[in-house]
Amino acid sequence: MSGADRSPNAGAAPDSAPGQAAVASAYQRFEPRAYLRNNYAPPRGDLCNPNGVGPWKLRCLAQTFATGEVSGRTLIDIGSGPTVYQLLSACSHFEDITMTDFLEVNRQELGRWLQEEPGAFNWSMYSQHACLIEGKGECWQDKERQLRARVKRVLPIDVHQPQPLGAGSPAPLPADALVSAFCLEAVSPDLASFQRALDHITTLLRPGGHLLLIGALEESWYLAGEARLTVVPVSEEEVREALVRSGYKVRDLRTYIMPAHLQTGVDDVKGVFFAWAQKVGL
């Protein structure tokens, strides 16, 4: 998908619904704990190395929120998966946060952490690192308390539907900001579906609102236990073009090249992108 004059549907089958159905079926085998072990425990979850992917993602988020430009009352996290790190810097800027995921098992995993249930995944190292990066002297326990208090709901979502949250959603709409990490490319069978999914979630955002998007670069598959999930490979330029087509001004776009020691055989990801984009309009 290159060239500003190309249709969002260029290069794709006329109907992506069969591909989307296959993706949805494959995700029924998704194992949240296996995914967390693969990506948020060492080596990828080792936050001691400042050049690691975990510190890089946390820095991108913290630095963007530190500008003071991404703020408001309501934020929606699109396709949260079983993770919360993507909201650690956001929670001091938004008092009403909605987390979402297509899979009930991921929503249950989030619920365990939010309710501080025994056996919930331990995000304390991420919380500590976020506090360190932000440099405000906040203790990680307070950071986690604030995040738990400000997540008001965990809802189902389907980014392939024109109304991703369904009709009559309890989430306040439109939101002041959206965050989404490793969702759109992981659930889209082709670039046209990726573009449409981005269009769909953009309807949840107010004009002038901000989107912080994190995703995989040039990845075609990843493992989550017994599940081997397909991913639409995207490049930095394809991400930029998709954002512009969906009506955004790209404020920042950064890339991280995955080093060899973090290529652990659980996927074929080449890198990670971070995009800060603002929805055009008043």
Curated annotation (Swiss-Prot):
Effect of altering Y35F? Strongly increases KM for phenylethanolamine and S-adenosyl-L-methionine
Sorted alphabetically, which keywords does the UniProt record give?
A: Catecholamine biosynthesis, Methyltransferase, Phosphoprotein, S-adenosyl-L-methionine, Transferase
Q: Which residues bind S-adenosyl-L-methionine?
A: Y35, Y40, G79, S80, Y85, D101, N106, D158, V159, A181
Recorded catalytic reaction(s): these are: phenylethanolamine + S-adenosyl-L-methionine = N-methylphenylethanolamine + S-adenosyl-L-homocysteine + H(+); (R)-noradrenaline + S-adenosyl-L-methionine = (R)-adrenaline + S-adenosyl-L-homocysteine + H(+); (R)-normetanephrine + S-adenosyl-L-methionine = (R)-metanephrine + S-adenosyl-L-homocysteine + H(+); (R)-octopamine + S-adenosyl-L-methionine = (R)-synephrine + S-adenosyl-L-homocysteine + H(+)
Name the Gene Ontology biological process terms.
catecholamine biosynthetic process; epinephrine biosynthetic process; methylation
Q: Which residues bind octopamine?
A: E219, D267
What Enzyme Commission number does this protein have? 2.1.1.28
Q: Enumerate the GO terms in the molecular function aspect.
A: phenylethanolamine N-methyltransferase activity
Cross-referenced InterPro entries, in alphabetical order?
NNMT/PNMT/TEMT_CS (IPR025820), NNMT_TEMT_trans (IPR000940), SAM-dep_methyltransferase (IPR053384), SAM-dependent_MTases_sf (IPR029063)
Q: Disulfide pairs?
A: none
**GO CC field:** cytosol
Record PTM Phosphoserine, positions in chain: S7
**Activity control, per UniProt:** Inhibited by methyl methanethiosulfonate, phenylglyoxal, tetranitromethane and diethyl pyrocarbonate. Inhibited by 4-oxo-1,4-dihydro-quinoline-3,7-dicarboxylic acid, 4-(benzo[d][1,3]dioxol-5-ylamino)-4-oxobutanoic acid and 1,4-diaminonaphthalene-2,6-disulfonic acid.
The question of whether Transferase is a record keyword is answered with yes
Top class in the EC scheme? transferase
What's one Pfam family the UniProt record gives for this protein?
NNMT_PNMT_TEMT
Q: Which NCBIfam families does the annotation name?
A: GntF_guanitoxin (NF041360)
| Role of this protein | Catalyzes the transmethylation of nonepinephrine (noradrenaline) to form epinephrine (adrenaline), using S-adenosyl-L-methionine as the methyl donor. Other substrates include phenylethanolamine and octopamine. Also methylates normetanephrine.
Family, as annotated = Belongs to the class I-like SAM-binding methyltransferase superfamily. NNMT/PNMT/TEMT family.
What name does this protein carry? Phenylethanolamine N-methyltransferase
Q: Which organism is it from?
A: Homo sapiens (Human)
